[in-house]
Amino acid sequence: MKVLPIAIACMSISWAASPAFSQDARTDLQQLFAEERAFLWRMDPLTATGDGVHDYDDRLPSVTPAAQEQRVAADQGFLQRLRAIDRGALTAQDQVSYDLFDFMVSQRLALAQHREWRAPLNSDSGFHADVLLMHEVANPRSTADYERYIARLEDLPRYFDENIANMRQGMRDGFTLPAEILEGISRIVAAEQFKKPEDCPLYRPFAHFPTTVPEADHARLATAGRSAIERSVIPAYSRFQEFFEREYRPQARHTIGASELPGGRAYYADLVRYFTTLPDATPEQVHQTGLAEVARIRSEMEAIVRELGFKGSFAEFLTFLRTDPQFYARTPQQLLREAAWITKEIDGQMPAFFGRLPRTPFTVKPVPDQLAPNYTGGRYNPGALGGAGEYWVNTYALDKRPLYVLPSLTLHEAVPGHHLQGALARELENVPRFRLNFYPHAFGEGWGLYSERLGEEMGVYHTPYQHFGRLTYEMWRACRLVVDTGMHWKGWTRQQALDYLAANTALSTHEIRTEVDRYIAWPGQALAYKIGELKIVELRRRAEKALGTRFDIRAFHDAVLENGGVTLPVLERKVEAFIAR
């Protein structure tokens, strides 16, 4: 069987801009980009708010089938207009934008045919959980801001009803989440049943008004906000729970693989291409790549076990790591302090590895309580455009959050991982707006995993256990290639996936369960990490070999990050251009 090739064949289209640069082509391209964003913001007010566009802050998106069809028709028009523009007449930077826009819109169309909107949630998030964060993105600063925010709260029942109607359509079509993972979602939905407005995160802007809002308006706005949550938000969550428990769970499918859905094999094949950003990637190739990486990393892990002089089998060593109290924080504050300390230690090394650093800061916060039980160990939240980023650390079930993986988690989610990457992208100048938040998963998650590896060179790992933790995180991502394709393409059961992760990683039993349920609910996404990291490592080795003593690690990293989020084929061409300078 063929292992997925890490080298990507260079496209026949020249990377450099054509000497026959056309201002008309550039004008047409910029107009197309502007019209696409304007349409997207109008159709998705939450994205508009996050992008700093406040024209639609008083409403939530429409997600009806008619709205979905409107999006498809618009994307077909956008793609047709793009293909009519002579790419060869563009500058090198505009060619990057052209290629990324092509990927973004064509992939939206490829996935739209599978009508994913019929299942608008996964194991740890979804429409019901996402809206509970909208107060942070909205961040109202004036009386008018608050009034628009209140109107958006009052629109929530309509938004929930449309999503419920879409889920009912999925039930009729056999396009549902698997019944086997719904218990965890049920716990999240139960935690979203608020007894009074003050218990709801969406009330927080009314608890503390900024000084920019006149004090004379505070009481009126607080009363209106409380009323909106009491009359609109709380009943909407109650109706959703009733629907989820009484209708959805009893009728959810009893298979777990995406390939078991109607049209599922074509659907999963499209997801593999989308999440890897590789047009020729196949599930079988990805699976074989995963098996090869698991074997390689296992040998490195076993070498550390021997170095420690542990008397026992590999499985017994994993049990020791999962159960010995020395490896776990005693309080949430201890875990958060450890994470914050690691971020500052990394900060001291950043100038030696990166020439360009972002202006935007980030903070360390616990995962919100209502999400934590079914959430991953940590995640990065970029926040609203212009605001600080957030490194979320999960403080739920501390005996399942080993400290020996905390350096890897921090490198991945904060710096030099997602915060560095995302903040630099948002600070790009003279690029179309869509690129500021563009996130091709293989590049984004591949960079996060590469950052964990870079931590070795930065001196972040101080003990053999932390080195083992780094390897277990890498092994975890290699296992994802095997497990995700196993369940969604090769017919694996959930138990097979659980057993495979338990046998090969030092993740806690709780983390293994939440991870497998995430892969089941979000098919294909787990492939992005290792495929992207392998490409970045391969490109670095290529640059080191080609440049020899002229290789500069800071310049290489800047070249990788200077265009924000890119597909792996675009990244390869950019690194080839870096080598040729």
For each feature predicted by the language model, list its residue ranges:
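N-terminal maturation segment of proteins
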Residues: 21-581
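Bacterial N-terminal signal peptides
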Residues: 5-16
